[in-house]
Amino acid sequence: MYDAEAIVIGGGHNGLICAAYLAKAGVDTILVEARDSVGGCASTVSDLGARFNICACDHSLIRAMPLIDELNLSFHGLDYLEPEATYVNAFHENNGSWVFYHDADQTIDGLSITHPSEVENYKRYLEDAIPVAELVIKIAQSGASMPEFLQAATQQKMKGISKLLRWSKASAVEVFKDYFDDWHLYMPGISTGPTVWGAPPEAPGTGLAATVYATRHLIASGRPRRGSGSLPDAILKSYLSNGGQVRLESIVEKLQIENNRVKAVELRDGNVIEAPTVIAACDPHNVLVNWIDEAPVPAKSLISRWQKEPSPEGYESKLDGIVQNLPTYKFMSELAGKFDHTELSQSTVIISPSPEKLKEAHVLKGQGLISDQPTMLASIPSALDPEMKADNGLDTFGLEVLFTPYSLSGGWQESKQPDRWLEIWGNAMDGDFRSQITKWRAMTPDVYERDFFMPKGHSPGYVASPLATLVGRSRELSRYKTPIKGLYLTGAGTFPGAGIFGAPGTNTAKTVLKSIDNS
């Protein structure tokens, strides 16, 4: 007798989405989560007398997904706030800044002030990139199969296909340099694309990162009211409203497999939960290498391939804290009188290194060292959402830093690196910003490993090109099914990848439901 029809392991937003769709379809589902609450890296937590987002607070791609309506998330409390400008793109040398708006015309108007020589280049870029971005979004929404790809392409009258295929083979730098003369125009796109993925922008296969600006013009970025965690909170309510079950503080030890079929999930405390279908919404490397004692014959080649892959290491950290006054960036004097109509304190500030310093940062990462000009994404969540103010009424900040390798030379325990990042961030501001910080904390890769059960602090990502995806390479990641009957993979490590997107969870649920219907 099974305990449920399906078990979803991992309560991050993709696991929650998958579970919610299954429960909505009438599938008896148990969600298993190692932590004492769901949400994963999309969580908002209480600490230091304030609420902090675990990772980025800006949500974009998920707002293009039908799941918000299909799971009735607005009814369950999800409400997005939109900053007047999405990003301020800044640089360590404190010049060349520019402002990015969701509206393309506003962005172009701003560039005519800050980078007039790049205006025509940006228009030419959008003319080419918008159709590619539209196609990429449709593929992500519909799933990775050749018939669905052709259907999406037909709906667009085949517009953008040739560039999508060409860009998917190229590097991000190659594509960007086809349009922009000034690296200040393209480095912010690299900072939120290949750098976040941990890949050099010169690497072949990173070219679709160049759609980043076009995508943000198509889909408005927003922040959930009361923090990023309002998203998983709403999904959880949707899931529970349809009879879903949750087991918290339940750490998975291994999967039980019999006759090439998944049979049960064995927990560290010795409890066993049985179900004919198991969806692992977590690091696929950990699932396939550490949770399966003896690979059944049909899965031996798959398991062997994953065993040969090194266990990936995390490279991102985040500082959170409370500040007495809003920061005054040095770029504000550069933009003074030109963008007074925009409340720039609401925007995320991307502080990018030069191309040369980024190359150096990649080399240092491999040596367990950290650049003196790291990529930084800074935000003041309370400037847009008063409900994110600290209990004492002061503002809160978040600062993401890349690269900060898990295998840091000297280790993280006694490291002074987080203090150094605050100093580097402060160099981008007027006055003594460091003295304005009353409390702060550091989420480094070792902390992500300890508190969020992320092996080596690593957040997985999906890196295959669209072409490789469409022809079905690494089918366990692109099609979500493994050779072990009843075992599926989902989450950030599966198509179409990481970030607050929700497409992996949605598409996996569709795949599982189709398999259940056909069984």
Kindly label every feature range from the protein language model.
Residues 239-252:
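A conserved beta-strand/loop element that lines the FAD pocket in flavoprotein oxidoreductases
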Residues 56, 492-513:
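A conserved FAD-binding loop/helix module that cradles the flavin
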Residues 182, 186-197, 214, 370-381, ...:
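A glycine-rich dinucleotide-binding beta-alpha-beta segment and adjacent secondary-structure elements
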Residues 327, 363-371, 412-450:
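Flavin-binding catalytic cores
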Residues 257, 515-519:
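Active-site-proximal substrate-binding core of FAD-dependent oxidoreductases
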Residues 2-138:
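N-terminal glycine-rich phosphate/pyrophosphate-binding loop and immediately adjacent elements
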Residues 130-242, 455-468:
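Active-site/ligand-binding neighborhood in enzyme catalytic cores
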Residues 253-390:
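Mid-domain catalytic core of redox enzymes
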